[in-house]
Amino acid sequence: RILNDMLMEAKTDVVVNYDTDVIFPPSSYLIAYDKITKLGYDLVYPYGQGEWQYKVTVNQDLINDLVNSDWSHSAFEDHDAKEKSTSDYGWAQFFNRKSYIEGGGENENFVSYGYEDNERPERFERLGYKVGRVDDTIYHMEHVRTMNSWFTNPHIENNKNLYERLKEMSPEQLKNYYDTVEYMRKRHGSK
């Protein structure tokens, strides 16, 4: 809900849904922004799909290197405690703000962790929005998972069922769902 609150309050043409535990090369931010403002994309992932993720173990050496490098992302590039992994969806998305709102924003019926990151790009593609990527690295700072930030959360089955139901909808049904879902009606002043 808070993400949608911020989306509605934003005044910029480009907005970013950004997890605080990731960092990208500076060029990725600029390319993602340009893809929206100059090339007409509606949704851009600022990292590649496939083997583009580095899982980074945060330790005192990394913190020291980060501070001593004037906060340069090169501290992550040079950090030994990282391993290559896959990347698909989640972490950060750049949006054309208007398209994000028209496409339903963040689905508030997903609760806690799970399946919202899978549903979002599928929805935007199926609704005809232009979705793209920046083929570059993502550094994900590994962290402890609580019950609510993993597949162990008590809402995971409901989230999965919602995702499966939305996947089965035609583009017209999906558009109708997002046009009439309660949280969007409230935001647009309808009951």
Model-derived features: positions:
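Short beta-strand-to-loop acidic/aromatic patch adjacent to the donor-nucleotide binding site
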Residues: 13-23
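Glycine-rich, basic loop-to-helix element that forms the pyrophosphate-binding segment
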Residues: 1-9
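Conserved catalytic core of nucleotide-sugar-dependent glycosyltransferases
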Residues: 7, 25-108
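Short, high-confidence coil segments that cap the C-terminus of an alpha-helix
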Residues: 12, 40-41, 129
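Alpha-helical elements of Rossmann-like donor-binding domains used by nucleotide-donor carbohydrate transfer enzymes
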Residues: 5, 31-32, 119-123
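Short, conserved alpha-helical segments within structured domains
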Residues: 20, 91, 116-117
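C-terminal catalytic/acceptor-binding lobe
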Residues: 87, 109-191
